[in-house]
Curated annotation (Swiss-Prot):
GO cellular component: cytosol
Pathway in which the depicted protein is active: Metabolic intermediate biosynthesis; chorismate biosynthesis; chorismate from D-erythrose 4-phosphate and phosphoenolpyruvate: step 4/7
Subunit structure: Homodimer.
Catalytic center residues: 72
Annotated protein name in UniProt: Shikimate dehydrogenase (NADP(+))
GO molecular-function terms, A-Z: NADP binding; shikimate 3-dehydrogenase (NADP+) activity
Family (UniProt): Belongs to the shikimate dehydrogenase family.
Amino acid sequence: MPKISGQTQLLGVIGDPIEHTLSPAMHNAALEYLGLNYVYVPFWVKPQQLGVAIAGLEALNVVGFNVTIPHKETILPYLADVSDLAQQVGAVNTVYRSEKGWVGTNTDVHGFLAPLRQQSCLWSEIAVLVLGYGGAARAVVTACYDLGCRQIYISGRQRERLGAFVASWPQITLHPLLWSERATCLAKISLVVNTTPIGMSPHTGATPLTAEDLAKLPATAIVYDLIYKPRPTLLLQLAMARGLQTFDGLAMLLHQGAAALEYWLGQPAPTAIMATALETALGTEK
């Protein structure tokens, strides 16, 4: 942590709640490693205070900030510009300054793709099942579309919300499945992505797919759970027991954060330092 002075530059993250964010740990480790007089702090911003908070961050000369739940979509009207990618996703998670004012972009797509790009898959032959239809699912759909995946299935509990989610992607053919139908396509699925909070601490005994469900997947399938606490989730434990390749959400958190830092600083982020900081922060959380 740098010695705070009148020259210290400010970065941060806004959300509600915000007390459990791991972003300060990885960003401050990176800033210290780079020898920069910056500090990254969390800001608890309630939805009804979002507009005031954005104006305040600008007035205080904050260099840039991340955006987390529940502001990723509602922040859009408060920005001077939004990147094409963020418009496609419909959500912003990173904001930086320009001559016009605040510019919003989305590094969640990059973060999600980082571990997948290391796989030797023929993505045009891959069918994907996305569990959930929230903001994280939007980033996942965009990423899978960019990869060129053959089919994308979306499963959720509420028929109306599921239909609205599918209708919001006129350029992409999505296949909706009600939650009770989510296991019906597994025999042809090569990538399963859980974007729901099912299995997240403290509800660690829950899983969106059972061992019986996972047994229907091809032996080469990948199971990707965006949750990173606990590690591993019950879903990933069951997938590993089945011999499937797995990823958790820590890689996504790391790489979206590294991409955000590069927007703010204009230089490569020390991802190895950030990864170590994340592992340490997770290990010391009670």
